[in-house]
Amino acid sequence: MKAEFVRILPHMFNLFLAVFPEIFIINATFILLIHGVVFSTSKKYDYPPLASNVGWLGLLSVLITLLLLAAGAPLLTIAHLFWNNLFRRDNFTYFCQIFLLLSTAGTISMCFDFFDQERFDAFEFIVLILLSTCGMLFMISAYDLIAMYLAIELQSLCFYVIAASKRKSEFSTEAGLKYLILGAFSSGILLFPCSMIYGSTGATHFDQLAKILTGYEITGARSSGIFMGILFIAVGFLFKITAVPFHMWAPDIYEGSPTPVTAFLSIAPKISIFANILRVFIYGSYGATLQQIFFFCSIASMILGALAAMAQTKVKRLLAYSSIGHVGYICIGFSCGTIEGIQSLLIGIFIYALMTMDAFAIVLALRQTRVKYIADLGALAKTNPILAITFSITMFSYAGIPPLAGFCSKFYLFFAALGCGAYFLALVGVVTSVIGCFYYIRLVKRMFFDTPRTWILYEPMDRNKSLLLAMTSFFITLFLLYPSPLFSVTHQMALSLYL
């Protein structure tokens, strides 16, 4: 007995190290919650506002989690299954979680100036961001339908609350309520097919489902329960990533939510959900059907995103439709059904996340003057030329103009589409990119050539957003000079899905 325990001890220790980042961030989240509750209600300390204090501690917790995740990297030479095989840790999980944590850290660093300007003292905001990050970390590593659904619900419940966190704003309350109702509907769409698949196969584990679906593929048999289950899971995922025709909720919720929440909703859930889509749909005999669904949604998202954004007059609604369009471009990678398509999808997600973080950091920097409409950006080049140049670089990258990172992302996605024979998909992507140039360049024209109705003196940005903008702009501008690291990482991630 003792010898057996000594033999398995190194394996248990490795598994503990593999899951330790999630354990740490969960404990840190609850410690911050207790810290906030105790001190914010303390008469001794005169009921201090703790949003910024908890924000800094939350940022530190995310960075420590990032270091713990990096420390476990040498253990990922092979895939590890843990917690009764509910979760899987491999290179794909590792890199997706690292990028998710970087996105969370970037979002939190954008919040501090917002707390001061809005006199926002609800420390629960940061706690909910950390808790939703826990859910997304588990979602990325989920290897079972039950674990997947519970992780999605954990992150979704936090999103419903933070969307309505600006209590004095009717728009924020409306956004949170809409998100709650429609999110509950999409969660039902996800839960129902999971039960259908379990009823048809008696399995919820992805490995077991892969073997069953491979058996169907070999024998040529079909199961209506499995087919409908996979179809409804795809619909639930498409709703979560705001792909057309399941996008209706996104513009209103993105506009009504506080700007840091909009930034978080635009970036973090897409990383985790696309990662989970790849986990769920990488196996099975229904790949051709799923490719057709993503093919249609990709085309519809690109067209609607490009055309609807042209009619927008508000900055956040324009960015919402831009996000829908970029989801269409990213879905090209899944529509290909090849390893090159998956790699291009991962490159597209990472570059989109950096561009979106950059754009929302600028929108938050302009919030000091309550910039809401595109017309409010008039003559920004004269009042704050550095910010105008940075915003212009981001818009050109969104439009896919070389030599910026956005061009490389779209080029690789279109190249993957051409490689698998999806010529029409690539053609629609190129045409919608050209149409999209109109509304992106219109913003640049407003900043450099239009005269505002009233002149505004912009205050300098705080250090956190300045540092964030510097790093993201540096990557967007100089990515094409040395793209090999990202290509190498995404290739490893794509390969690890098949191992």
UniProtKB/Swiss-Prot annotation:
It catalyses: a ubiquinone + NADH + 5 H(+)(in) = a ubiquinol + NAD(+) + 4 H(+)(out). Its EC number is 7.1.1.2. This is NADH-ubiquinone oxidoreductase chain 2. It holds the Pfam family Proton_antipo_M. Coiled coil: none annotated. GO terms for molecular function: NADH dehydrogenase (ubiquinone) activity. Keywords: Electron transport, Membrane, Mitochondrion, Mitochondrion inner membrane, NAD, Respiratory chain, Translocase, Transmembrane, Transmembrane helix, Transport, Ubiquinone. Its main location: mitochondrion. InterPro entries: NADH-Q_OxRdtase_suN/2 (IPR010096), ND/Mrp_TM (IPR001750).
